[in-house]
Swiss-Prot record:
Protein name per its UniProtKB record: Dehydrogenase/reductase SDR family member 7C-B
Signal peptide: 1-32
Underlying gene: dhrs7cb
Species in which this protein is naturally found: Danio rerio
Amino acids binding substrate: S186
Protein family per UniProt: Belongs to the short-chain dehydrogenases/reductases (SDR) family.
GO biological process: intracellular calcium ion homeostasis
Keywords attached to this entry: NAD, NADP, Oxidoreductase, Secreted, Signal
Amino acids binding NAD(+): 49-73
Pfam families: adh_short
Highest taxon above the source species: Eukaryota
The protein's Enzyme Commission number: 1.1.-.-
GO terms for MF: oxidoreductase activity, acting on the CH-OH group of donors, NAD or NADP as acceptor
Enzyme class: oxidoreductase
Residue stretches in coiled coil: none
Length: 318
C-alpha cells in the first residue's frame, strides 16, 4: 500500500467521523425541537400543580412546564424561595407566551394547614388539569435509632400529605371527567432497603394508594401515573478534599446509578403526553434487584443481610 493510499484512507476516516458527529448533532437538535413542541402542546393553557417545587426535580418541572405555557401552581414550604423561583421563571420567558405562576405555601409536616391550601387553590382555579406529587422527605438510619415522632413526620410528608391533597381535588376532577395525576415516587416504593425502614414504608404506602386510585378513577377519564426513580443525582454536600471511597458508597448522589432532576422532569412531560401508567427510571442494577426480589426472594434477603453486616463492620468505633 502506497503513501497515497494511506492518505486517502485517513481522509476517508476523517470524513466518516465528521459525518457521524454531524449526524449525532442533527439528531440531538431534532430531539430538542420535538421536546419543545411536545411541551407546548402537552401543557399549554393547562392548570398544573407541583408540590415541593423548590426541590431539584420540582424546580426542573417548573422550568419545563412554564416554558410550555402551563398555568403553574407552585407549592413549597418557604415563601421567599418560592418568590425567587417565580422571579427566575418570569425573567427568563416571554410574557406573551407564558403565565405568571401562582405561589402557594404548603408544608405537609403541618397537616392542619392542608385543607386551607386546597380551598385557596380551588377559589383561584375552579379546576386543575395536572397534579404532580413530588414531595418527599428522605431519611437513612437504623430502625432502633428512629423515634415514633420521626416516623409520623415521614408518613405525613410522604404519604398523608399527598393523599389528603388528592382527595381534596378529586371531586372537581371527577365532575369534569378529566385530569392527570402523577406521583414522583422512589424505587423504594417497590424495593425496600436496609436503614430506610420508615422511608421505604411511606413509599410503599403511597405507591399502593395511587395504584388503587388508578383503577377507581379510570371510568371518570382520569389518568394516574407513577414514576419510580433511583437516587437523584445532585451536587454533593461533601467537600472535594474530603471525598473518600467510603463516602462515595454512602453518598448516592455521586453514584452512576442515579438519575438527573432534568431527566425526571423530561420523563414527566413524556408521561403526560403518552398517558403511560407506570415508569421505572433505573439502570440495570436496580432493575435486576427487582427481578431477584420477585424470583429469588431468599437470595435477595441474604444479599440485604450481607450489606448490613458489611456496613456495621465498616463503621468505626466512636
Amino acid at each position: 500500500m502506497g503513501m497515497s493510499d494511506i492518505m486517502w484512507l485517513d481522509v476517508s476516516w476523517a470524513w466518516l467521523v465528521l459525518t457521524a458527529v454531524l449526524l449525532a448533532a442533527a439528531v440531538f437538535y431534532l430531539y430538542t425541537l420535538i421536546l419543545s413542541h411536545l411541551a407546548k402542546t402537552t401543557v399549554r393553557n393547562k392548570v398544573v400543580l407541583i408540590t415541593d417545587s423548590l426541590s431539584t426535580v420540582g424546580n426542573e418541572c417548573a422550568k419545563l412546564f412554564h416554558a410550555g405555557g402551563a398555568r403553574l401552581i407552585l407549592c413549597g414550604s418557604n415563601w421567599e424561595k418560592l418568590e425567587a423561583l417565580a422571579e427566575q421563571l418570569t425573567s427568563q420567558s416571554d410574557p406573551t407566551l407564558t403565565f405568571p405562576p401562582k405561589l402557594v405555601e404548603l408544608d405537609f409536616s403541618d397537616m392542619e394547614s392542608v385543607p386551607e391550601v386546597i380551598s385557596e387553590i380551588l377559589e383561584c382555579f375552579c379546576c386543575l388539569d395536572v397534579l404532580v406529587f413530588n414531595s418527599s422527605m428522605k431519611l437513612k438510619a437504623p430502625v432502633h435509632s428512629l423515634s415514633l415522632q420521626m416516623d409520623r413526620l415521614l408518613m405525613d410528608v410522604n404519604y398523608f400529605g399527598p393523599i389528603t391533597l388528592v382527595k381534596g381535588f378529586l371531586p372537581s376532577l371527577i365532575s369534569r371527567r378529566s385530569g392527570h395525576i402523577l406521583l414522583v415516587n422512589s424505587i423504594q416504593g417497590k424495593l425496600a432497603m436496609p436503614f430506610r425502614t420508615t422511608y421505604a414504608a411511606s413509599k410503599h404506602a403511597v405507591q399502593a394508594f395511587f395504584e388503587c386510585l388508578r383503577a377507581e378513577v379510570q371510568e371518570y377519564g382520569i389518568t394516574v401515573s407513577t414514576i419510580n426513580h433511583t437516587f437523584i443525582k445532585t451536587s454533593s454536600s461533601i467537600p472535594k478534599d474530603e471525598i473518600t471511597a467510603r463516602s462515595m458508597k454512602t453518598d448516592h448522589r455521586q453514584t452512576p446509578l442515579g438519575v438527573s432532576p432534568k431527566d425526571v422532569a423530561t420523563e414527566l412531560l413524556r408521561t403526560l403526553s403518552s398517558k403511560k401508567k407506570e415508569i421505572l427510571m433505573a439502570r440495570w442494577v436496580p432493575k435486576a434487584a427487582l427481578y431477584v426480589r420477585s424470583l429469588f426472594p431468599n437470595l435477595f434477603f441474604a444479599i440485604m443481610a450481607a450489606r448490613v453486616s458489611n456496613t456495621v463492620a465498616e463503621t468505626p468505633d466512636d
